[in-house]
C-alpha cells in the first residue's frame, strides 16, 4: 500500500494546535481550492474513538459522501482516522503532534491509502493520488502556518 508522510512546524502551542485539528469543521479551511469538504454529521459527538463522521467532498459539481471513523485519539498527542466509505478503498490517516522549538508544534501526518483497482491500473491511480496528496500537504502546511500563529 502506498504511504504519504508529511511534517510541518507551526508557531503555536501544542494544546492550541490539537484543539484546531480536533474540530472537524476546521478541515474545510485546510483543503486547497478547488477541493471542497463540508461536515454533515458526527455520531457520537464530541469526537472520540468510534465516532463516525460524514463529509461531503469533491471538486465543483463532482461531489460524494465520505464516511470516516475516528480510530484512536490521545489529547494533545495524536489521533487516527480511517475511511469507511468514500473516494478510496483504503485511507488510514495518523496525525501526531509533538512539542517543537520556541514553543511551537510539529505536525506529522502519515497516510496509508489505496484508491483501487488492483494491478497496474491501480498502481498508476495510486501514484497519481499520492502526488495529489503530497501537493495538498504543501498547500496545507502554508495554510496551517497562517491559521496557527500562536
Task: Name each region found by the language model.
Residues 39-85, 106, 139-142, 147-150:
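Glycine-rich portal/gate segments that line the openings of hydrophobic small-molecule binding cavities
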Residues 10-12, 59-61, 72, 87, ...:
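Beta-strand elements of well-folded, non-transmembrane domains
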Residues 1, 92-95, 137-144:
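Secondary-structure boundary/capping motif
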Residues 80-135:
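Beta-strand/loop substructures that line and gate deep hydrophobic ligand-binding cavities in soluble
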Residues 7-11, 56, 69, 96-98, ...:
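Generic structural detector for well-ordered beta-strands
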Residues 3-5, 63-67, 89-93:
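Short, surface-exposed coil-to-beta transition loops
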Residues 1-48:
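Hydrophobic ligand-binding cavity/cleft-lining segments
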Amino acid at each position: 500500500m502506498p504511504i504519504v508522510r508529511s511534517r510541518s512546524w507551526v508557531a503555536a502551542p501544542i494544546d492550541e494546535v490539537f484543539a484546531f485539528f480536533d474540530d472537524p469543521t476546521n478541515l474545510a479551511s485546510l483543503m486547497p481550492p478547488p477541493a471542497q469538504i463540508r461536515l454533515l454529521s458526527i455520531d457520537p459527538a464530541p469526537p472520540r474513538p468510534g465516532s463516525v463522521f460524514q463529509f461531503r467532498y469533491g471538486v465543483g459539481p463532482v461531489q460524494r459522501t465520505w464516511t470516516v471513523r475516528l480510530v484512536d485519539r490521545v489529547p494533545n498527542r495524536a489521533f487516527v482516522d480511517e475511511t469507511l466509505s468514500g473516494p478510496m478503498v483504503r485511507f488510514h490517516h495518523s496525525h501526531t503532534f509533538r512539542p517543537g522549538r520556541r514553543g511551537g508544534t510539529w505536525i506529522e501526518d502519515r497516510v496509508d491509502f489505496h484508491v483501487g483497482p488492483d494491478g497496474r491500473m491501480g498502481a498508476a491511480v495510486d501514484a497519481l493520488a499520492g502526488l495529489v496528496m503530497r501537493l495538498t500537504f504543501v498547500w496545507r502546511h502554508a495554510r496551517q502556518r497562517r491559521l496557527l500563529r500562536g
